[in-house]
Curated annotation (Swiss-Prot):
Annotated localization: Cytoplasm
Reactions mediated catalytically: 3-deoxy-alpha-D-manno-oct-2-ulosonate + CTP = CMP-3-deoxy-beta-D-manno-octulosonate + diphosphate
Keyword Cytoplasm attached: yes
Protein's name according to its UniProt entry: 3-deoxy-manno-octulosonate cytidylyltransferase
Length: 268
C-alpha cells in the first residue's frame, strides 16, 4: 500500500439523543473529540481537522491545539459536513480525506493509514472503507451490524443490515429455529462493515448534489447513495475488529475503563 499524504477530518456534532454533549465527554482529562484527534495525529495524516457546528467544541479543540473548522448546523449527514470542509479548505480534487468518527477515541492509527492507502491504490474508486470477518452468529442477524459483500476486485457489491450473503445450506428452517447466537456460521465469511471512510475531495464536493436513493432510505445507510449513483467503493478487509465507539453512557464507561491501559502503552 502507498502511504501518500492525506487529511483526516473528524465530524463532531454536539447534539446527540443518546449521549448529550458527546464530543465534550471527558476521557482521561480531555474531551473525547480531542482524544480522537490525538489518535488521528498518530497516523500518517498530513493534517487533522475537527469539523463541528458547535463553538464550544471548536473552542475545546483549540485549547488543546487541535485545528477546528466551524460548519453549518443544517447538514443532513457527516459526509455533507465533510463536503463543506473540502470546499472551505480548498482541497485539490485528488486530495484524499479520511472521515474519522468523532466517537471512536480508541481507533487504531494504522487503520486510518490503511484505509487512505487503500483508496490511493484503487484509482477507479471514489471511496474506500473497511470490513472484518464476523465471528459471532448473533452479529450476523443483528440489524445494527452492517454487512458488506465484495467483488473479486475488493469493491463493495452491497451493504445491508440484513444477513448478507444468505447462507441457504447453513440456515435451514431447523437452524433458524435456534436462537441467533446458536445458529451455524456459514462457510463463506460474512464481513462486518467498519464505519471509517476515505474519499477523494472531488467526490465529496459532488455528494451534496446527489439525490437520496430509495435503497439508502430503506436501509438508512448513507454509503448506498454513492453506489446507487454508480460510484465504486473499495473495501479493505482486516482480520481485527476495531474497538467499539461511544453511543451510550455505558459505552463511555467502558472506554474510560480501557483508557488507562491505552495510556500505559502510548503515553498521555
Amino acid at each position: 500500500m502507498s502511504h501518500a499524504p492525506f487529511i483526516a477530518v473528524i465530524p463532531a456534532r454536539l447534539a446527540s439523543t443518546r449521549l448529550p454533549n458527546k464530543p465534550l465527554a471527558d476521557i482521561g482529562g480531555k474531551p473525547m473529540v480531542v482524544r480522537v484527534a490525538e489518535r488521528a495525529h498518530q497516523s500518517s495524516a498530513a493534517r487533522v481537522v475537527v469539523a463541528t457546528d458547535a463553538v464550544s467544541v471548536a473552542d475545546a479543540c483549540m485549547q488543546h491545539h487541535i485545528e477546528a473548522v466551524l460548519t453549518r448546523a443544517d447538514h443532513a449527514s457527516g459526509t455533507d459536513r465533510l463536503a463543506e470542509v473540502a470546499t472551505v479548505l480548498a482541497l485539490p480534487d485528488d486530495a484524499i480525506v479520511v472521515n474519522v468518527q468523532g466517537d471512536e477515541p480508541l481507533i487504531a492509527p494504522t487503520l486510518i493509514d490503511n484505509v487512505a492507502a487503500h483508496l490511493r491504490d484503487h484509482a477507479d474508486c471514489a471511496i474506500a472503507t473497511a470490513a472484518h470477518p464476523i465471528r459471532a452468529a448473533a452479529d450476523i442477524f443483528n440489524p445494527n451490524v452492517v454487512k458488506v459483500v465484495l467483488d473479486a476486485a475488493e469493491r463493495a457489491l452491497l451493504f445491508s443490515r440484513a444477513p448478507l450473503p444468505w447462507a441457504r445450506d447453513a440456515w435451514t428452517p431447523a437452524a433458524l429455529d435456534q436462537p441467533a447466537a446458536e445458529r451455524p456460521l456459514p462457510a463463506m465469511p460474512v464481513l462486518r462493515h467498519i464505519g471509517i471512510y476515505a474519499y477523494r475531495a472531488a467526490f465529496l464536493r459532488r455528494f451534496p448534489q446527489l439525490a437520496a436513493a430509495p435503497l439508502e432510505q430503506t436501509e438508512q445507510l448513507e454509503q448506498l447513495r454513492a453506489m446507487w449513483h454508480g460510484e465504486r467503493i473499495a473495501v479493505l478487509t482486516t482480520d481485527d475488529a476495531p474497538a467499539a465507539g461511544v453511543d451510550t453512557a455505558e459505552d463511555l464507561a467502558r472506554v474510560r475503563a480501557a483508557w488507562s491501559d491505552l495510556l500505559s502503552q502510548d503515553g498521555p
